[in-house]
C-alpha cells in the first residue's frame, strides 16, 4: 500500500528547469529557484515532463516521507513558476502601513512604530495604507512572514481591530451588557 499523495506525478510546467542529482532536487523558474534534499528511502526521477517519486519500501515512516516529499516538491515547482502570495488587511482607526526601503513600517496604536524587514527571497508591498502583500517562491516562508506580521497586532474579537488575512473572518463577541 503506497502513499496516495506520493504516487501522484508532479507536472513540470513550461519555463521550469528541474535537476535531480542523487538526493538533491532543485527547481528554477521565472520567479526564482529553490532546492530540497529528498529524504532517504525516496527516489525522484524525471520522466518526460513529470517528476515521479518512488519509495524503497512500504513501511509507515517511508510512506509518510513519500507523501511529504511529493507535496514539498510540487509546492517548489509551483512556487518558482507562479510564486505564492498572502494579503493582509489592517483594520482600525489610525492603523496603517508605510513602505520603508525593502521593509514596511507599521503604525498600530503602540507608542512606537514597528519596522518589518523581509527575509531573503520575500518581497513586501503596500498596496494602500491598509493592505500589505507578502510574496515569494517558498510557500512556508511566505506563510511564516505573514503570520509574524499578523502577530504584531492580532485582531481582537470585539471591534475586529488589528491585522488579519484578507480572507479571514473574525469571530465577533458581544460587548458587555448594559443595565
UniProtKB/Swiss-Prot annotation:
What keywords tag this UniProt record? Answer: Ribonucleoprotein, Ribosomal protein, RNA-binding, rRNA-binding
Question: Entry's InterPro entries?
Answer: Ribosomal_uL6-like, Ribosomal_uL6-like_a/b-dom_sf, Ribosomal_uL6_a/b-dom, Ribosomal_uL6_bac-type, Ribosomal_uL6_CS
Pfam entry (one): Ribosomal_L6
Keyword set includes rRNA-binding: yes
| Highest taxon of the lineage | Bacteria
What Gene Ontology terms describe what this protein does at the molecular function level?
rRNA binding; structural constituent of ribosome
Q: How does it assemble?
A: Part of the 50S ribosomal subunit.
Its family remark reads: Belongs to the universal ribosomal protein uL6 family.
Main role? This protein binds to the 23S rRNA, and is important in its secondary structure. It is located near the subunit interface in the base of the L7/L12 stalk, and near the tRNA binding site of the peptidyltransferase center.
Any idea what this protein is called?
Large ribosomal subunit protein uL6
Organism of derivation: Bifidobacterium longum (strain NCC 2705)
What taxonomic classification does the UniProt entry list for its organism? Bacteria, Bacillati, Actinomycetota, Actinomycetes, Bifidobacteriales
Amino acid at each position: 500500500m503506497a502513499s496516495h499523495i506520493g504516487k501522484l506525478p508532479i507536472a513540470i510546467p513550461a519555463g521550469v528547469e528541474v535537476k535531480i542529482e542523487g538526493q538533491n532536487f532543485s527547481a528554477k523558474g521565472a520567479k526564482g529557484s529553490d532546492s530540497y534534499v529528498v529524504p532517504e528511502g525516496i527516489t525522484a526521477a524525471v520522466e518526460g515532463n513529470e517528476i515521479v517519486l518512488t519509495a524503497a519500501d512500504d513501511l509507515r515512516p517511508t510512506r509518510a516521507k513519500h507523501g511529504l516529499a511529493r507535496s514539498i516538491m510540487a509546492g517548489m515547482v509551483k512556487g518558482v513558476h507562479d510564486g505564492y502570495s498572502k494579503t493582509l488587511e489592517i483594520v482600525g482607526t489610525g492603523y496603517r502601513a508605510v513602505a520603508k526601503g525593502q521593509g514596511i513600517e507599521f503604525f498600530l496604536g503602540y507608542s512606537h512604530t514597528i519596522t518589518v524587514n523581509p527575509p531573503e527571497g520575500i518581497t513586501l508591498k503596500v498596496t494602500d495604507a491598509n493592505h500589505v502583500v507578502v510574496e515569494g517562491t517558498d510557500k512556508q516562508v511566505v506563510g511564516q512572514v505573514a503570520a509574524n506580521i499578523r502577530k504584531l497586532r492580532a485582531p481582537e474579537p470585539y471591534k475586529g481591530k488589528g491585522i488579519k488575512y484578507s480572507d479571514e473572518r473574525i469571530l465577533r463577541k458581544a460587548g458587555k451588557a448594559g443595565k
